């Protein structure tokens, strides 16, 4: 919604995004959606998360927009990527803000938790600028942080203010979230989310057994079809990465070598939930730097 996002012009960028998000939210409020049970609700708008450099900007724009009185009763959504060590801290800030909002009679918001699908772009930026890699550099910590965020979000006092969207095609991650929701008696406050055309047999089974499932489908006009290329490349990467569940999903059998490989990875990440790094990889603070003429 804004092509000139700049971290250096933080306040100005957030103000512009706030104006544009407000316009979108107003239209969403004016156009209702009828659920299968006949209940009418305002159209739902989810604010996606892409590049690491936009993380704080996206969060600030989301909060500032919803803090306006006209959106006090509107439920919008935001996405956080578990492959960023920073995301769990953002989730906690979001949750505390949402709790205060709900306590005052405001509408809850929704958080979609994903693992992240822009690793190659983040690696490129890191190399080109000689910066530390923003995401984790290993899958174990990504998976552990994902569970850490899901576990925190599933706590009854948290999920009632910040409803959850559990976005995954991994059977182990889906089962982990489902068990937590059942144990905490919060199944009414979360739903599974998947992508159209990905692990369709898993999607069908989930719909038959879990009921509430949100399916994402990309849309691009013929004139703007080039915009779909980035989406396609990310999906190809997810379907071929050696450690990724989707690589093995089509013919996966319980008890097979592939199943045991994936199970062991899941169990290792469960053991590392509280050990995954929770502080940013990029810690440069220019306000504390000392000028060295020799450099």
Where in the sequence are the language-model features?
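Positively charged, amphipathic and often flexible ligand-engagement surfaces
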Residues: 1-294
